[in-house]
Amino acid sequence: MTIAIHHCLSLLNSCKNLRALTQIHGLFIKYGVDTDSYFTGKLILHCAISISDALPYARRLLLCFPEPDAFMFNTLVRGYSESDEPHNSVAVFVEMMRKGFVFPDSFSFAFVIKAVENFRSLRTGFQMHCQALKHGLESHLFVGTTLIGMYGGCGCVEFARKVFDEMHQPNLVAWNAVITACFRGNDVAGAREIFDKMLVRNHTSWNVMLAGYIKAGELESAKRIFSEMPHRDDVSWSTMIVGIAHNGSFNESFLYFRELQRAGMSPNEVSLTGVLSACSQSGSFEFGKILHGFVEKAGYSWIVSVNNALIDMYSRCGNVPMARLVFEGMQEKRCIVSWTSMIAGLAMHGQGEEAVRLFNEMTAYGVTPDGISFISLLHACSHAGLIEEGEDYFSEMKRVYHIEPEIEHYGCMVDLYGRSGKLQKAYDFICQMPIPPTAIVWRTLLGACSSHGNIELAEQVKQRLNELDPNNSGDLVLLSNAYATAGKWKDVASIRKSMIVQRIKKTTAWSLVEVGKTMYKFTAGEKKKGIDIEAHEKLKEIILRLKDEAGYTPEVASALYDVEEEEKEDQVSKHSEKLALAFALARLSKGANIRIVKNLRICRDCHAVMKLTSKVYGVEILVRDRNRFHSFKDGSCSCRDYW
């Protein structure tokens, strides 16, 4: 090998883009080594594995080579299997078979079967399995393990276990693969059975069981496995912290994070972003601030994903200035996620004009928006009532950025028209959509009809929803709300009766409030224990004071039964956000900000109570409902009564 060719190979190893690679390819041609399988194999390997969007070039290299060998084919099959187009792996594999002079080996089958797992085609998987049998490679450990993964990915646990049972001496990788397959096919008992049979287990075995239980929502089993683990690594702790948070047990997630620190281990990027995500979901502002301090002190502030999580946490906890401070501090490290998170945060708080300005600043910096950016932007326009701007940006998506609108973007436009009262325009917009509208899109319009009291259109929309999702309790409640607001109690009773007959249960409303770095959860209705009694007693005091000092009159249209006015007042007084507010006022020091997170949309009566309480008690109240943030201060709300 000459010095020049050796230099070309060293350049290839450091090559970062397709343009540079084509220049190196030109040098190979110049030195006459382009027909050598070793050098062409190196080029294909670099195209397929190391450079993004270079797979078509790798394929052309393969097609132009006189007699490509198995290594070249395997490399391309592997490249496609790890790409966004895994189905192309099968085409390359078939091409290899047709050549006649190249025979697939264990690597060929392992790569192509992995590709089949990624695009989840059980029929193609069966065909590849048959080919492996034909070539006598089904008993190969590498191929067998990949077959287990493929069948598990396609939801066919029975075949995954059959392949495993037929293996002569399965290694730990195969054991772990079949446990994973069981969990992916929702066979939790089968996974436990196989785990109990293992004579030798490694860290991965325990972590697979832990992750499987978490994904299945079996938290008690996950905790038991976690406590039995002989050694807990970063993956174990991260799985536990993130998984428990995703299952809604936020306080427990925080406890495990503290336990991780007490164990003398340092949180990694995954556990940090996971616990910050838990703070975001639960609205745990105080614990989030502590985590931010830890991030700064421990030197994690350079990690982009952690900063993005901080932006999201502060935004969802109601502190936009702090989110903006983190965002501004990132400077050159900002990625599309950073910009989008900040735009989404502003949108959540009704700062539509500022969100639009930031979007324009992002594009001026040369950052190209993606589909998610436009969802946040359209969301901002919707909550700020910027109808014309929203229409312009929706048009700009495809015309300027060549982004095909997806169902979420159409949903944002329906919300934009619906919130502004342009209900017929929203209806016509849905009818003219080039893609079939989903139940969520129609439900968005139904919510707007309910808010604006348009019963006639609400009934039409409900008919559409009956075709897509007839037994959704939320739709029936929205229609019931519209009838109740109009005083049509017979129609309300009819809906309630049909829900009882069909055994359709209404989604339980709950609210979270942070007191002393602990999250407390309240549900609507009367409870006779612990903190619920305390909250109810304080709420009675608040309601009396609001009536005396602010002339509060309950908006009984929020009560959904045809009962006496006094009973309606009693119903609306027990909403979960009111109980959370009362508990916070009872426990927090005077003047402390109150932060409440609710899973459903705040009703008009609760909204009125929050406004009056902020004035009478001199407190700032932040409520995050299903749709947006409401910042109550001095008797007014940041949403300007538009939500």
UniProtKB/Swiss-Prot annotation:
| Protein source organism | Arabidopsis thaliana
Residues covered by region (Type DYW motif): 549-643
Name where the PPR repeats lie: 69-103, 105-139, 140-170, 171-201, 202-236, 237-267, 268-302, 303-333, 335-369, 370-400, 406-436
What PANTHER family would the database entry show?
PENTATRICOPEPTIDE REPEAT-CONTAINING PROTEIN
The name this protein carries in UniProt is Pentatricopeptide repeat-containing protein At1g74630
One of the entry's Gene Ontology molecular-function terms is: RNA binding
Signal peptide boundaries: none
Give the gene symbol. Answer: PCMP-H71
Protein keywords: Repeat
Q: Which GO terms describe its biological process?
A: RNA modification
Q: Which Pfam families match?
A: DYW_deaminase, E_motif, PPR, PPR_2
Family membership, please give it.
Belongs to the PPR family. PCMP-H subfamily.
Q: Where is this region: Type E(+) motif?
A: 517-547
| Ranges where the record places region Type E motif | 441-516
InterPro entries, sorted: DYW_dom, E_motif, Pentatricopeptide_rpt, PPR_At4g14850-like_plant, TPR-like_helical_dom_sf
